[in-house]
Regions:
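Boundary/activation segment at the start of structured domains
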Residues: 16-135, 382-412, 489
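Acidic, divalent-cation-chelating loop motifs in proteins
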Residues: 240-244
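Acidic, glycine-anchored loop motifs typical of Ca2+
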Residues: 44, 88, 245-251
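Solvent-exposed, polar/charged alpha-helical surfaces in well-ordered, non-transmembrane soluble domains
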Residues: 51-58, 62, 93-100, 146, ...
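Cysteine protease catalytic core and zymogen-processing segment of caspase-like enzymes
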Residues: 47-53, 93, 106-109, 114, ...
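Pro/Ala/Gly-rich low-complexity, hydrophilic intrinsically disordered segments
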Residues: 256-432
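Bacterial N-terminal signal peptides
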Residues: 4-16
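Short, flexible helix-coil boundary/hinge motifs
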Residues: 402-489, 496-511
Length: 511
């Protein structure tokens, strides 16, 4: 009986741990307007910042406990996003109101023992003031660097906060004030530098996902009807970046996914600068866990046969772009019970995926190709974006050469094998089929010649005349040798085909 209290305590602890959950809260802001002041005041209005915020909000509604969106959607956006009715103005006043609401929810969830994760997303104009400090444009003013770090982020007391910004000069938001504010392309080593990380020293629970582009056309794209970075980010968070198949998208995975998405864009006007920094305290925290997603269907399986493909919903919103490596199984979240369009450069098909059962990519067939006219820059984006294959092989190479502070996911525990180990042995298999065909034809020929030889041997046995006997013997020997030769070719071809079918390169076998 003396062990009963300990048993009760253990059961209580187990119960409390079982009840603990991961709670996501999301705040998405999108504003198309131009800044009232600053070096970017001459910039034109954006077209899709409101769409960006609503696209993030649409995904957040399926995985978050609460999602708030601040935007001024135009009529076209309202028609494409049913959740437009939930928007509030993207102003400092509404931002502070949303922070108060979400802060209270986060505090309650934390008190209940939940592990709280927060998304803070912004899309719009970024600009630099006369002192070189970064600002984000809102309808009633500016969200300054100081307000962001000293007021906004501290008001979101989650275990981890994921700061996602799609704006010009976004990278200046994490630079110390003594670092030049000139927008430059950031290499992996520069992203890893202490000068870029020092801004987050007092916020070690905050991770950063940012992008800026050399011009507005690269920042936004009519094909996507959203910002390019936002679309790439959401393609990854919907499951495209989940390289080890555990349902969680971590920072190293999304960084590799973004790198692959932009790798083949050769036109510098169309190239994004992306920056991904994981929270210092939790480098392997998940940005999203798709396993508990609600009101969604899943497209699953190996999709390499589709090449570079895209998924659009029934209202024309681009949900995902991806080009999967050979053998890489993907698991993509899509709306349940409504038509979605799956397409690539050669064709398309409409699918209605159900929440209670996944749809397998390998069961999908496309038809009806289509083409469109395009400009040089648009052509560069269409050829380059998502042209590189993504999967375990690309991910492994990326993390090996990237920021050493980036903590990679464990691929061995997931059962996911590197694509290099599963590369299609297409040439060997084609040669094997050819060898098998020769073996089959030779076997048939051997049988025919053997039959002819048997008939000639019968003629030889049944005749008593010298000349017919000699002729029958010659036929018998000729057909016999032909049968033996064909049989030998068949055996050798069959053996060669077997070897080719099971052949692996020495380097792959060693792996």
């Amino acid at each position: 009986m003396r062990h009963v209290p300990f048993l009760v305590l253990a059961l209580g602890l187990a119960s409390s741990q079982a009840q603990a959950a991961t709670a996501l809260f999301s705040l998405a802001i999108g504003y198309n307007g131009v800044p009232a002041e600053g070096s970017a005041s001459g910039a034109g209005s954006l077209n899709f910042a409101d769409d960006d915020a609503l696209a993030v909000h649409e995904l957040a509604r399926t995985v978050a406990r609460r999602s708030v969106v601040l935007a001024l959607p135009d009529r076209a956006t309202q028609a494409r996003y049913p959740s437009s009715s939930e928007t509030r103005p993207p102003s400092l006043v509404e931002l502070r109101r949303a922070l108060a609401t979400l802060g209270a929810d986060i505090t309650r969830a934390t008190a209940a023992g939940d592990e709280v994760t927060v998304w803070f997303f912004y899309s719009g104009h970024g600009w630099l003031d006369s002192d070189g400090r970064a600002n984000l444009t809102l309808a009633d003013g500016a969200l300054s660097q100081d307000v962001l770090y000293n007021e906004v982020l501290p008001a979101l007391p989650g275990r981890t906060v994921h700061l996602m910004i799609d704006a010009c000069h976004a990278e200046a938001l994490i630079r110390p004030r003594d670092v030049t504010a000139e927008t430059v392309e950031l290499s992996a080593s520069e992203v890893a530098s202490a000068s870029l990380r020092s801004r987050l020293e007092h916020l070690p629970n905050v991770g950063v996902l940012m992008a800026s582009a050399s011009n507005t056309q690269a920042h936004e794209w009519d094909d996507y009807q959203t910002g390019v970075f936002t679309h790439e980010l959401l393609s990854g968070l919907r499951g495209g970046a989940d390289v080890n198949g555990d349902g969680r998208v971590e920072y190293s995975e999304i960084a590799a996914f973004l790198a692959a998405a932009n790798r083949e864009v050769t036109d510098p006007r169309a190239r994004l600068t992306t920056l991904v920094v994981a929270p210092k305290l939790y480098p392997r925290v998940a940005i999203v866990d798709t396993r508990g997603a609600r009101d969604v269907a899943r497209l699953q399986g190996r999709a390499h046969h589709l090449g570079r493909f895209q998924i659009d919903d029934q209202r024309g919103n681009r949900l995902v772009d991806l080009r999967a490596e050979f053998g890489f199984p993907v698991d993509i979240l899509v709306p349940a019970g409504e038509p979605i369009l799956l397409s690539n450069e050669s064709g398309e098909t409409t699918i209605i995926a159900q929440a209670d059962r996944p749809t397998n990519f390998e069961d999908v067939s496309l038809e009806k190709a289509h083409t469109r006219a395009r400009s040089a820059m648009v052509d560069a984006m269409r050829r380059g974006l998502f042209a590189a294959e993504f999967g375990p092989s690309y991910y492994g190479g990326f993390v090996d050469s990237a920021d050493k502070q980036m903590v990679p996911v464990d691929l061995s525990a997931s059962g996911v094998r590197f694509a290099a180990e599963e590369q299609p042995r297409t040439a060997h298999r084609r040669a094997a089929w050819s060898a098998f065909a020769v073996a089959g034809a030779s076997t048939v020929a051997a049988g025919i010649f053997a039959g002819l030889a048997a008939r000639a041997y019968g003629d030889f046995q049944n005749t008593s005349l010298e000349r017919p006997s000699i002729a029958a013997r010659d036929r018998y020997e000729s057909y016999g040798y032909a049968a033996l030769g064909a049989a030998a070719v068949g055996v050798l071809s069959g053996a060669l085909g077997y070897w080719l079918w099971h052949h692996r390169d020495d380097a792959r076998s060693a792996n």
